[in-house]
């Protein structure tokens, strides 16, 4: 038998897989779930840009993991790199105008997927789970 806490983490991991598969199978506007999350964080940030390391920390990945995800987004023009005028060692990831447009369109599809996954759940339960996840891992906003 395993602890309730360990079972919770296993179920969170399974849920993440279910969510990613659902998003990826629908290929929401050509974006996978991780792509969508990156665009969301950039879209929501001040000036629609972030340092790569800050973006990685915000979404819980390594800097190299974020770089692997950003390269295809950069190739298709959804994000770009911007250097810091004061410090050449610092660069920013910026969501492009086209990236903003695609994100806004994909957000509608993402909301529909979310409703499909969570439609039978009560708002109070969702708030409680959201609070627990925030306590465990922080808020992406």
Write out the residue ranges for each language-model feature:
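C-terminal regulatory/oligomerization modules of transcriptional regulators
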Residues: 1, 123-141
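N-terminal leader segment of winged-helix/HTH proteins
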Residues: 1-29
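N-terminal positioning helix adjacent to the helix-turn-helix/winged-helix DNA-binding module
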Residues: 4, 34-35, 98, 125
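Alpha-helical linker/hinge and terminal dimerization helices associated
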Residues: 12-15, 19, 23, 59, ...
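N-terminal helix-turn-helix DNA-binding core of bacterial DNA-binding proteins
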Residues: 21-62
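Short, hydrophobic-biased segments on the C-terminal half of alpha helices
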Residues: 52, 70-71
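Charged, amphipathic alpha-helical coiled-coil/dimerization segments
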Residues: 71-128
